[in-house]
Amino acid sequence: MKFTPELESGVLIKRYKRFLADIMLPNGQEITIHCPNTGSMKNCLFPGEKVWFSTSDNPKRKYAHTWELMQTDQQHYIGINTGRANALAEEAINRQVITELLGYEHLKREVKYGSENSRIDILLTSQNRPECYIEVKSCTLLEDQMGYFPDAVTTRGQKHLRELIHMVELGHRAVLLFVVQHSAITSVKPARHIDPHYADLLEQAVANGVEVLAYKTALSPQGSLITSACKVML
C-alpha cells in the first residue's frame, strides 16, 4: 500500500477529544489533524516526536489531514490509522502472503453476518469449501517487547469473538487476524490485564475452533505492507 500523495511530517503536540491531534509543522505552524484511532493508543503517543500525515483534497472534510504514522526516537514506526488494517489484510491475501488463507476464489468486504447485527471485515468463499469469516484487528500496544490486544476494554471486540464462535458452530471457518502495526512487536498476546473478559472469550473462541493469526507490517512514510507471520501467545 503506497501513500499517494506522499506523507508529510510534523511533531506531535497532543492528542485530544479522541479523534483530534495538534502537531507542529517544520515551519513552526501548528495545525489540527484527524486521528483515525478509537483505541486508547497506549504507548503510542510521544509528544515531541515525529508524526506522518496524509492529506485529502476533499473540500467537504473539516480536517484535511489524517494521522498515519508515529515515528519514535528509537526509529520505530507505529501505524496510527486503524482503518488501514483491513486494506492491508486484503492486499496481503491477494498477494498470497498469508499462507493460511490461500485457495479461495472470491473476497468480499464488510458483509453482514451473525446474530448481533455485525459486518465481517473479510469474507472468503470458494466452491466446495466452507466460507471463511475473517475479523481483522490492528495491534499497536507494545509492553516489555510483547504486543498486546486490545489497548482498552472493547465490548465491540467481544461481540466479534462471539460472532466468530457462532460461525464455527454453523460449520464455517472463522479467523481472527491481528495486523501488527508496530515495528518493534514480534509476538502478540491477549491483553488480559486490560480486558480480562476479552481474553477469556478469546480462549473460548480458540477452544471452539476459531483460528488466530498475526502478521507483521513493514511501515514507512512511503507505504505499508504486510510481510510475514509472527507468533501468537495464547
Swiss-Prot record:
- MF terms (GO), sorted A to Z: DNA binding
Instruction: Provide an example Pfam family for this protein.
Output: SfsA
Q: What is this protein called?
A: Sugar fermentation stimulation protein homolog
InterPro entries documented for this protein: SfsA, SfsA_C, SfsA_N
- What Gene3D superfamilies has UniProt attached to this entry? 2.40.50.580, 3.40.1350.60
Which branch of life, at top level?
Answer: Bacteria
Similarity comment: family membership: Belongs to the SfsA family.
